[in-house]
Amino acid sequence: MLTKKPVLSPDRCFSPEPVQRRLAHQFFDSISALPLVCPHGHVDPALLANPAARFGSPTELFIIPDHYILRMLYSRGVPLEALGIPTRDAPTETDHRKIWQLFAEHFYLFQGTPSGLWLKDELTNVFGVDEALNSRNAGRIYDYLEGLLALPKFSPRALFKRFNIEVLCTTDAASDNLENQRSLHEEGFTQIRPTFRPDAVVNLDAPGWRENLTKLESSIGREISSYATFVQALEERRAFFKKMGATATDQGAATPYTTSLSDQEAEAIFARALIGKLNPGDVEQFTGHIFMEMARMSVEDGLVMQMHCGVMRNHNPALFERFGSDKGADIPLNIEWTRNLHPLLSSYGNNQRFRLIIFGMDESTYSREMAPLAGHYPTILLGPPWWFHDSVNGMERYFNQVMETAGIYNTAGFNDDTRAFVSIPARHNVWRRVACNWLAGLVTRGLVDEEEGYDMARALAYDLAKSAYKLD
């Protein structure tokens, strides 16, 4: 490109203190070439199933699908329809060059944020852009990116190989036929594995619950008319996912509340859901009971269970009505783990066939609840900092609050948890850098020795994720 201008510091995420910075570089150099293990994320498998697939325009790649970008721009008054997001009640901008220009004019908003760091990394290291994006060079950079995206070497499959991804797990609805994964496996492309995500049918207040139940019925070829047949359907689909290479499930809820209902109680709630006449409290009780059922099934089939809790979805109802979900309007909640998980752990917490990875948005629970739980129960692992805390400072807070009680070997390593495929290397790079800098700090303070630091760096970068998700 034109004027050479470095936009990424080689010392990013590292301490300014010389001894710690030197050690951080040494640790990072020792693990930077390790393959990427991506055990949880939201990449569309269709991108990889079709050898001819391309990403489309720069706007389609970087802006339209990224709710991190949408929420920041919306917070500063940029209408979502101006960013190409379809709405139910107004025209939507279709000129992708115009959308990119608007994005570039507001690129300064991402200064100091994880999104800004990822975007700079993607533009620099994936696409070779050697100047900072701004309103003046937006058109030129758009043309440059558009040209690259048309080339075979920038296809999703080519970048998958270039990124050195060892395994990538998608997140798929319980009713998904997994045809994309099947076609990939038939080609010998077995690095792509599904993950069983039943939220759309087990959370009775999920948008479109009845329609999603119909899809589940279609996937098993029969009617679901009772709670008993519903549970049978979930068990069958889990078996299908496992046959297709899945090693894990994932379930999200506002809180990690768990409870055991009798068959009669569960049947009564499900019957009310079928006719659309739920009572107050039914949703929480049923979700809490299904967490217990998912744990039981995990003991039986060996799939790792993941729980993502602590977010209020669609906090902005007006935005949801116009644009739908996943547009940046989800907000963290304060939650409680110790009492909520007690029924589940009383039943399964000591069962060596059970493995539970927990993710939370309430950082106040890291040292008070999450780390002590993982530091005691042999079945629990802590997931990495999630969503709003997937950042340099968020990772540092996580390490400092979790590791004293749980150690690193009761954690699940890192997962990128992203829809943005080209951001995967950048996200892993930040995690590895922050981890190495934190470890270097431990060494300089005499808390671990240098040899232990190298071992821990490898574990955090690679080994822990493979082991946690049974990808060995």
From Swiss-Prot:
Which BP terms from GO are recorded? D-galacturonate catabolic process; D-glucuronate catabolic process
Alphabetical list of Pfam families matching this protein: UxaC
EC numbers listed for it are 5.3.1.12
Q: Signal peptide: which range, if any?
A: none
| Pathway named in the protein's UniProt entry | Carbohydrate metabolism; pentose and glucuronate interconversion
UniProt KW Nuclease keyword: no
- Residue ranges crossing the lipid bilayer per the database entry: none
Name the domain of life.
Bacteria
Q: What chemistry does it catalyse, as a reaction equation? A: D-glucuronate = D-fructuronate; aldehydo-D-galacturonate = keto-D-tagaturonate
Q: Which UniProt keywords apply?
A: Isomerase
What molecular functions are annotated in GO for this chain?
A: glucuronate isomerase activity
Family the UniProt entry places it in: Belongs to the metallo-dependent hydrolases superfamily. Uronate isomerase family.
Q: What is this protein called?
A: Uronate isomerase
